[in-house]
Amino acid sequence: MIDRYKHQQLRIGSVSPQQISAWAKKILPNGEIIGEVTKPYTFHYKTNKPEKDGLFCERIFGPIKSGICACGNYRVIGNDKEDPKFCEQCGVEFVDSRIRRYQMGYIKLACPVTHVWYLKRLPSYIANLLDKPLKELEGLVYCDFSFARPIAKKPTFLRLRGSFEYEIQSWKYSIPLFFTTQGFDAFRNREISTGAGAIREQLADLDLPIIIDYSLVEWKELGEERPTVNEWEDRKVGRRKDFLVRRMELAKHFIRTNIEPEWMVLCLLPVLPPELRPIIQIDGGKLMSSDINELYRRVIYRNNTLIDLLTTSRSTPGELVMCQEKLVQEAVDTLFDNGIRGQPMRDGHNKVYKSFSDIIEGKEGRFRETLLGKRVDYSGRSVIVVGPSLSLHRCGLPREIAIELFQTFVIRGLIRQHFASNIGVAKSKIREKEPVVWEILQDVMQGHPVLLNRAPTLHRLGIQAFQPILVEGHAICLHPLVCKGFNADFDGDQMAVHVPLSLEAQAEARLLMFSHTNLLSPAIGDPISVPTQDMLIGLYVLTSGNRRGICANRYNPCNYRNYQNERIDDNKYKYTKTQEKEPFFCNSYDAIGAYRQKRIHLDSPLWLRWRLDQRVITSREAPIEVHYQSLGTYHEIYGHLLIVRSIKKEILCIYLRTTVGHISLYREIEEAIQGFFRACSYGT
């Protein structure tokens, strides 16, 4: 639908019978009103043409071929001449055949029918509004019992009988036996009410503002009651309060959306456009039909039978009429939700029919498969793997995916740089994977962000922008810090990649959707790019090292290491003074270089020369040992620190006892802080 602000939107909810009729009815130029489907037929078995007033009628839903009526006459669509725009013989309009994708029909039901989604789905909206048990309402809907009409002025058969009960379940089988169809209708219209008509009457009599006021008063009264000793009674009161809250919210929703409660009971049943429930001819002349067509036929058959009972057969017992109304109700229930009342309806091959609910809901439903998750151009999909060397705003695209996504841009680059004379030559170079193709692809990707999306997209961080780079393999590489926003992990999850084409989309991706600009949760404001899972384990391994102090390492042989930096077996170890000391390094580059040359391990303790830091110098920790040298200098040895002083007690240098893992982590943090300050200074 399109609102007054020209915004296209989709609204799902209850509609009035007048709206259903407006969707389906058409007035032909000769004044004839069409739109009602009255026959359960589809195509004629001889001519293979749609049956008139059937489920595929061309008068109701439009022509199968554009501009050609059922008689075979042809008119030019959009011609402004005074030629008639419909065939006077068959009544088919000369319009585009695409009208069969959205033109609806309707079935006029012989009796009211409740919408099973509002009755049987939990919570039951009808039971909530009427404040009645669901089992009691089901008995009314399926004609298991009736209730007396509240007629105060006129004397009725039930009043003379002295029955003031609400339900007359004991008369379910006795009352209809005394009447024929005509007599039973008169009796039912005066004395009792049953079926969906009884529900419709009660819903129509509701005053929603009064329901809200009464529910609020009762909720306050229950809230003022003190807890009792009986736990069961307290739970009962709590459930009643929750029910009243739901009832008030539902009534407010009906008022806010201008929906009448009686619309939950159907008098007109919409018929889907035929293109949404097609019949397809396959090899061998066989036909494949949508299950919806068979369910519609079932409804029409039973509805026509009920019409015949009410109009022609005046000697039919009333019990048979009630039974047929129940069959119509069950047929409509099966159309909306097959199996909601128990055993589902099956075809001759014992296959369950797919109803509206089966077509709409679920991963393979209409919304998730063809509207939300449909395939689009300039998109791809692959498994995600961790890319720990990537920046936060980058992602790795496999070469095969990247060349397909950016193929048009690469073709334009090849032609502009005179590597190809036309599109055909450019495509051949791409198929042959010439080196110049990858160079141009690199240039194209540098200035073009991509969007990564992981279904289901439940919040705005489910789709983010990244700067792509080429990687080997067939998987998309992703920084582990952005996984929490996507609710993704690396156990086989798949993600879709999209290319924003327009300049507006690219600007939006860069300014609003880049991953490094979405570090906080939009819901609560907490950081969402935090280390989890593998990153925490990696940080632990990186910084675990040997946490014992220098004394423990000196006197505890269990933590001593030999010159090859390997663990020593406790049983075979013997302490000797010939073992090498822990190595000294002048800077972090030398320490990391020694690790890469495999001269030390990641958690090997070492001494690293450090700059003069006032926080280290002013430490109040007492030295463990002091070593004096022959030239007058001396070394103050602390738990994780060594200070070299001169004769005048001036600090010459400082050594920190650390590991390669700690050095690597410190360098990463330092580079990140420096990059942040450079970005801030550049921005100012």
Swiss-Prot record:
User: At which positions is Mg(2+) bound?
Assistant: 489, 491, 493
State the compartments where it is located: Plastid, Chloroplast
Its main localization is plastid
Q: Provide the E.C. number(s) assigned to this enzyme.
A: 2.7.7.6
Q: Which cofactor does it need?
A: Mg(2+); Zn(2+)
Q: What Gene Ontology cellular-component terms does the record carry?
A: chloroplast; DNA-directed RNA polymerase complex; mitochondrion
This entry's comment on the bound cofactor is: Binds 1 Mg(2+) ion per subunit.
Tree of life domain:
Eukaryota
Keywords, sorted A to Z: Chloroplast, DNA-directed RNA polymerase, Magnesium, Metal-binding, Nucleotidyltransferase, Plastid, Transcription, Transferase, Zinc
For this protein, the record's Gene3D superfamilies field holds: 1.10.40.90, 2.40.40.20, RNA polymerase II, clamp domain, RNA polymerase Rpb1, domain 3
Q: Which InterPro entries match?
A: DNA-dir_RpoC_beta_prime (IPR045867), RNA_pol_asu (IPR000722), RNA_pol_N (IPR006592), RNA_pol_Rpb1_1 (IPR007080), RNA_pol_Rpb1_3_sf (IPR042102), RNA_pol_Rpb1_clamp_domain (IPR044893), RNApol_RpoC1 (IPR034678)
Instruction: Write out the catalysed reaction.
Output: RNA(n) + a ribonucleoside 5'-triphosphate = RNA(n+1) + diphosphate
One of the GO BP terms on file: DNA-templated transcription
Q: What does this protein do?
A: DNA-dependent RNA polymerase catalyzes the transcription of DNA into RNA using the four ribonucleoside triphosphates as substrates.
As for family, the record states: Belongs to the RNA polymerase beta' chain family. RpoC1 subfamily.
This protein's assembly is summarised as: In plastids the minimal PEP RNA polymerase catalytic core is composed of four subunits: alpha, beta, beta', and beta''. When a (nuclear-encoded) sigma factor is associated with the core the holoenzyme is formed, which can initiate transcription.
Q: Which protein is depicted?
A: DNA-directed RNA polymerase subunit beta'
